[in-house]
Amino acid sequence: MSRPVIGIASYRDRARWNIWDTDATVLQQGYVDGVHRAGGRAVVLPPDDTDADVLARLDGLLLPGGADIDPARYGAARHAQTDTPSADRDAGELLLLDAALAAGLPVLGVCRGLQLLALAYGGTLHQHLPDLVGHNGHCPAEGVFGEHPVHLVPGSLAAAVYGERTVVNSHHHQAVLDPGALHVTGRADDGVVEAAEDPSLPFVLGVQWHPEVFGDPELFAAFVAACAARSLQGAASSR
């Protein structure tokens, strides 16, 4: 059986290696490794080529973490702690996401990816969690991961992967405020949304933590399995 083909959104940033210091298409290797180890084939989607017709060649879409989403997308003024927006990245990833949802493709959103899912479903974000929860445990410092338990709703996709409680890493200062039409299926002890999904579709799941950082084979395995099922469905319908 051929491996399912999974598109992973990337972004443009400044990068340095050897003698070079230049703009580059960037994606953390952990996402590619997670897909490959679970039996999928990862395809990196360039940030400046987000025509939705590429989805016809894919069996799933993964939206990775990254910089804050432009608050204008959900009708808010920019908080002093919010990153400088990347309008092109926001627009491109939301275009891909909307098309993937319309096509019924499996979608996994990680950190920023969960937040994009919330916006696609009509939700909003909180721009700086310390203002809301009174601590910085979700992002102790730049490049330093926090760790905390997450409680998951029985019967959800997330609970099928982890059980009803798991401990996750954490590196975010923003979070879903209103999930829109998404169903919240995981929260931290302080109430912060940590997982959300669309139960009307086979696999649409966003998580606020980073499964690509320390290795999280269970989540990647569940996602790739859903993509493989989608691939088989497509092969059967084309006969």
Predicted segments, located by residue:
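N-terminal beta1-alpha1 cap of cysteine-dependent amidohydrolase-like domains
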Residues: 1-108, 119-121, 126, 130-159, ...
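Conserved G/P- and acidic residue-centered "switch" motifs that form tight phosphate/ATP-binding loops
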Residues: 111
